[in-house]
Amino acid sequence: FLQYISYYHVAEHFFESIFWDDIVLRVKDRLTQPGFSYKRKKDLVSFIKYIVKAIDVRDESLTFSEQTALRLTLEKYIDLNRLKAEIDEYDDSLVSHYSSAIVSFSGGNTADLQGPDQGAVFSALAARIYKTRCAMVHSKDGEKARYMPFKDDHLLVKEIPMMRFIAEQIIIGTSSIY
């Protein structure tokens, strides 16, 4: 439990900055498109709808989708081929496990690390990781997806190596020598 959450926190540390960097780039791109005009109402309405869809307002502050921020973090720092190789070296059954088995206690979907569409792989990976994390930390009575200590440990143990190698790549990708 603690290992998974600790590795998740490595990625979570970068969520806000990566999410806002992505929004800023997308806004700049939309504003500088040749077909965009700040004088055309339909262009502005479309632009506003885009912004509203990308962010949430809660308690008078701007928030974002944590799962989207996780996906963006993975896209920025994770080399899927390297991740697959590291997981295979650790346990050569895990890559096929991730692609064929859901995380039953969380509803975490399959994630085919060998899939041809990197965007789809990162989305599936983010969903699997995020749903698993949520089932672990939001284990209210009555919730469908929740982690049960001891009972679900044998399932969680298969998710830890993936989180470890992801955390390691993020740490290496964000490190600098002074």
Where are these regions (language model features)?
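Amphipathic, oligomerization/interface secondary-structure segments
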Residues: 1-178
